[in-house]
């Protein structure tokens, strides 16, 4: 194992280096952020005009 992968958890070190791990972190957090924004938007639209009886 490489010693320069200090940000990567030990079980993921064979797959990721630090740069890959940081990019993965950005992608995952962006996906979660999008999901939260989408859920809030759906809730607001449902409160405005319910689409289920």
Swiss-Prot record:
GO molecular function: bacteriochlorophyll binding; electron transporter, transferring electrons within the cyclic electron transport pathway of photosynthesis activity; metal ion binding
Cellular component terms per the entry's GO annotation: plasma membrane; plasma membrane light-harvesting complex
Keyword Signal: no
Periplasmic side: 49-53
Record flagged with keyword Signal: no
Record topological domains on the Cytoplasmic side: 1-25
Domain of life: Bacteria
Transmembrane stretches, start-end: 26-48
BP term (GO), one: photosynthesis, light reaction
Membrane topology term: Single-pass type II membrane protein
Compartment(s) where it occurs, according to its Swiss-Prot or TrEMBL record: Cell membrane
Residues noted as binding a bacteriochlorophyll in the record, renumbered to the chain: 24, 42
Modified residues (N-formylmethionine): 1
Keywords: Antenna complex, Bacteriochlorophyll, Cell membrane, Chlorophyll, Chromophore, Formylation, Light-harvesting polypeptide, Magnesium, Membrane, Metal-binding, Transmembrane, Transmembrane helix
NCBIfam families in alphabetical order: pufB_517_ASD
UniProt record similarity statement: Belongs to the antenna complex beta subunit family.
Function: Antenna complexes are light-harvesting systems, which transfer the excitation energy to the reaction centers.
Oligomeric and partner information: The core complex is formed by different alpha and beta chains, binding bacteriochlorophyll molecules, and arranged most probably in tetrameric structures disposed around the reaction center. The non-pigmented gamma chains may constitute additional components.
Protein name per Swiss-Prot or TrEMBL: Light-harvesting protein B-808/866 beta chain
């Amino acid at each position: 194992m490489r010693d320069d992968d200090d940000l990567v958890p030990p079980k993921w070190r064979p797959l990721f280096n630090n740069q890959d791990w940081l990019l993965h972190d950005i992608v995952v957090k962006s996906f979660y952020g999008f999901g939260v924004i989408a859920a809030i938007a759906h809730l607001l639209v449902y409160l405005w005009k319910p689409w289920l009886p």
